[in-house]
């Protein structure tokens, strides 16, 4: 046996290992082999087996023979502790029941088995021989091990089982493989990193950081206590975060990304379908909530959700606290706190697109923009509390679905459309039910009948085909209209143009202001004009001679003034002169008649001639 110099530090290590081991009562003896170069083994049953420049200190400390043909022994290996093995060149193992496997590997720590054992079943053993390969084969036993080129294992029961693997922490595991007898075959986990008690990084380039964190996919990363990344390129960050889809990302406590390419960001956020993006606390992608009406159910593929407690179906977008995209359509977008979309676009706090009377069960192509706006069935609502196809309560919540609203448009605060193909524009402008194709424009305007038009502040058109244009006009007669400031038309087929007019007659027309027309079929022209029923004039007697007039049975009259407020009728064309003519006669025609009358009669006698006009006296004497 060759002599070898034992430094004070080496003696301290030897003494410490001896005193801390189960064999503290056994004297420590150091030896060198006769065939090795500067190798040293100290302790009961320790052995360097011909290793070169190697050191084995402790009970059952073991450096095996070289397994490469032509190689003398393991070079520059160090094994310190009870039941330890350094089986690779330049490897280092420190602790009880620890193992290093390949070149440059490091294992520091020990197992947690109670009692004193000698076993070749202590975890993973590369090549045991001689006295080190006998005794009990234990079950449920885990040794500290660094098996792989450049592997590093630090901590009790820590294991680094592949090339470049790093495990730090009690029972941490980096890499995986299979054991055939006393030979370990690494299958995965190259360059893997596991840091934290009971953490595990089992696939190539995987990283697990945190207590019981788990990275089991290639290039996967799990950071946080109980975090898990279980698919290739998955990332889970946060306590109990879970990323199980390929390329999925889960960030936040209890977050989960189960779909491929899914993103869940926020505490308890979940993206459970492929391509889903959910951002915010408790954000979730959901199945089609209206699948019961025949739409295909799905699990939120390509859904996007951003905000606390958001919900998004497949292809939907939900952004904002409590926002929800219910239907799996590309046009399903809900943006804003509490926004809800069942197939269209809802933007604004509490904005919603909901199913109305549409048999398909969706509100596809609907748009709702503004706080508490509501749209049902292919409508458009713009403005706070604007609504189409559904009425609202006083506090702005949906009340009931109306009989109409398809293709309706409401623009303005509190505007509403409750009939098909109708339009309401302005604050509190409304088109009520049973008023298809109606129009209401202006503050407090209202159209409540088919094809009705109300334009102006407070304008109201309440009968079919009516027109009310101007402030405060009220038109309730079918096919009637009013243009101007507050006028009222209740007659059928009647029109008022002007201000402050009242027409209760049917088929009547007023052009002027402050006119009250109650005469059917009449026409009133001018400010403050009045009208009364027409009086028939069948004929007239002159000097006892009766004359009958044409047009002696009028159905109504035209008024252009009032008593004391008469008006001339100017620029009247010459009317026809005949026994049956009903044309108006202008001044020139009357002038022609009077001119002839004023010429008088020419009389001739034996004494001469003379002229007498109508009404003049002519005296005739006998000769």
Residue ranges and their predicted role:
Residues 1-623:
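Primarily extracellular Gram-negative trimeric autotransporter adhesin
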């Amino acid at each position: 046996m060759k002599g070898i110099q034992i430094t004070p530090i080496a003696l301290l290590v030897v003494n410490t290992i001896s005193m801390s081991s189960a064999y503290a009562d056994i004297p420590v003896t150091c030896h060198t082999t006769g065939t090795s170069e500067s190798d040293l083994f100290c302790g009961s049953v320790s052995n360097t087996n011909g290793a070169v420049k190697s050191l084995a200190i402790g009970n059952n400390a073991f450096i095996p023979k070289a397994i490469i043909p032509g190689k003398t022994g393991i070079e520059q290996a160090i094994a310190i502790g009870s039941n330890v093995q350094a089986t690779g060149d330049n490897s280092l193992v420190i602790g009880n029941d620890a193992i290093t496997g390949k070149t440059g590997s490091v294992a520091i720590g020990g197992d947690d088995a109670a009692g004193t054992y000698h076993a070749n079943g202590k975890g993973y053993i590369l090549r045991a021989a001689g006295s080190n390969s006998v005794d009990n084969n234990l079950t449920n036993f885990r040794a500290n091990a660094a098996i792989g080129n450049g592997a590093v294992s630090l901590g009790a029961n820590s294991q680094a089982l592949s090339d470049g693997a790093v495990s730090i922490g009690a029972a941490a595991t980096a890499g995986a493989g299979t054991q055939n007898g006393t030979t370990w075959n690494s299958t995965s986990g190259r360059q893997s990193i596991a840091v934290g008690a009971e953490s595990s990084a089992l696939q190539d380039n995987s990283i697990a950081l945190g207590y019981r964190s788990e990275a089991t996919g290639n290039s996967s990363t799990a950071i946080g206590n109980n975090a898990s990344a279980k698919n290739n390129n998955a990332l889970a960050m946060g306590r109990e975060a879970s990323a199980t889809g390929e390329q999925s990302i889960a960030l936040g406590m209890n977050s989960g990304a189960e779909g491929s390419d899914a993103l869940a960001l926020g505490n308890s956020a979940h993206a459970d379908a492929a391509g889903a993006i959910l951002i915010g606390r408790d954000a979730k992608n959901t199945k089609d909530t209206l699948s019961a009406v025949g739409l295909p159910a799905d699990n939120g593929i390509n859904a996007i959700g951003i905000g606390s407690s958001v919900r998004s179906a497949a292809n939907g977008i939900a952004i904002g606290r409590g926002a929800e995209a219910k239907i799996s359509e590309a046009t399903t977008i809900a943006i804003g706190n509490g926004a809800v979309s069942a197939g269209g676009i809802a933007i604004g706090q509490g904005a919603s697109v909901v199913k109305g009377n549409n048999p398909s069960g969706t509100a596809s192509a609907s748009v709702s923009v503004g706080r508490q706006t509501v749209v049902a069935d292919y409508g458009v609502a713009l403005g706070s509390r604007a609504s189409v196809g559904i009425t609202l309560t006083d506090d702005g919540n949906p009340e009931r679905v109306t009989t109409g609203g398809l293709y309706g448009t409401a623009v303005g605060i509190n505007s509403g459309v409750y009939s098909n193909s109708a339009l309401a524009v302005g604050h509190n402008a409304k088109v009520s039910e049973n008023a298809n194709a109606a129009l209401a424009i202006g503050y407090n305007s209202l159209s409540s009948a088919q094809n009705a038009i109300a334009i102006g502040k407070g304008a109201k058109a309440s009968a079919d085909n009516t027109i009310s244009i101007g402030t405060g006009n009220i038109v309730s007669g079918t096919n009637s209209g009013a243009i101007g400031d507050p006028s009222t038309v209740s007659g059928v087929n009647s029109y008022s143009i002007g201000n402050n007019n009242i027409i209760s007659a049917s088929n009547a027309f007023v052009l002027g202001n402050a006119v009250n027309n109650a005469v059917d079929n009449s026409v009133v022209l001018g400010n403050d004009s009045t009208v009364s029923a027409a009086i028939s004039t069948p004929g007239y007697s002159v000097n006892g001679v009766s004359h009958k007039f044409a047009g002696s049975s009028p159905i109504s009259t035209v008024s252009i003034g009032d008593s004391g407020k008469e008006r001339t009728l100017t620029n009247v064309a010459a009317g026809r002169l005949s026994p049956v003519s009903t044309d108006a006669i202008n001044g020139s025609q009357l002038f022609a008649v009077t001119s002839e009358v004023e010429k008088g009669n020419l009389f001739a006698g034996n004494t001469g001639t003379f002229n007498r006009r109508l009404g003049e006296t002519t005296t005739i004497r006998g000769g």
